[in-house]
Amino acid sequence: MTFDIIGLCVERPDPVTAVESVLPLAGGLTASTVEGGPVAQLRHPDGRLLLSIEDARLVRVPGEARRLLGIGDEVEVPHPVWWVESRAPEGDPEAESVARAFTEALVGGTGGLSWSSR
């Protein structure tokens, strides 16, 4: 299982900038890309995977992000919205913290909101 967190961004996101803003927070994190896989992976200095970040996808169908995530009408979801999904290994509090910090930096730079699996 994974801890999933999604940035729902008003403006087209720049994940590289968000990754760069998170690297100093945990001291010694490294970022790399994976051919044919997520845009980036963030790793702990000991080499363990903390976060996988997927490419941004533009969701153009009105209400689709709300429907997919089960978000109620009381929450305003931008439209159209850029969807950036990240996954952290389950049971690793540091990985969840890095995932939340990344998504907060991403949404902070683009406007929007985040959703998580918990």
Name each model feature, range by range.
Residues 1-118:
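Acidic (Asp/Glu-rich) sequence patches and key acidic residues
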